[in-house]
UniProtKB/Swiss-Prot annotation:
Lineage of the species this protein comes from: Archaea, Methanobacteriati, Methanobacteriota, Methanomada group, Methanococci
SUPFAM superfamilies xrefs: DNA-binding protein Tfx (SSF89915)
Source organism superkingdom: Archaea
Keywords noted in UniProt: DNA-binding, Transcription, Transcription regulation
Protein name: Putative transcriptional regulatory protein Mevan_1098
Family: Belongs to the Tfx family.
Length: 142
């Protein structure tokens, strides 16, 4: 399968996941720890670029976007998502509780004491996945 990662990067990441130190990996691969460090760093950068690319693509194909306004009670967000997804005939893959957990993890900086303090965008994909985007970044793109 084609990837943004080289075979060496994949091997290093797999070994790191198994708990090996960079020094141990360097010894096994016959190179320096500094080289392994650079390989790992570039692998993580490539992964981040791939994630960003997917986010851009998902944003392009997203059939539905919701602007969550300042002053919105966080507890109302799941209902807003379900209403919008029903309009678009999209089955959201999450329960209300899961959406609340998702919002808590991915939109913390926009929320204080249950209230939205800065607007943000929720994107609903055709496959039912949801994503959080910064409103100002979204506005700048359009």
């Amino acid at each position: 399968m084609e990837s943004f990662l080289t075979e060496i990067q994949i091997r290093v990441l797999n070994l790191r996941k198994k708990g090996h130190t960079q020094e141990e990996i360097a010894h096994v691969m016959g190179t320096s720890r500094a080289n392994i460090s650079m390989v790992e760093k570039r692998a993580r950068e490539n992964i981040e670029k791939a994630k960003n690319t997917l986010n851009i693509y998902n944003d392009i194909i997203a059939p539905s976007k919701i602007k969550v306004e300042k002053g919105t009670d966080v507890f109302n967000i799941p209902n807003v998502i379900f209403s919008k997804s029903d309009e678009e005939e999209i089955h959201v893959n999450y329960s209300s509780l899961q959406i609340m957990e998702f919002i808590n993890q991915n939109a913390k900086r926009y929320i204080k004491n249950r209230m939205v303090v800065e607007p943000f965008i929720i994107t609903i994909l055709q496959n039912g996945e949801i994503y959080v985007h910064d409103f100002e970044e979204e506005k700048a793109k359009n």
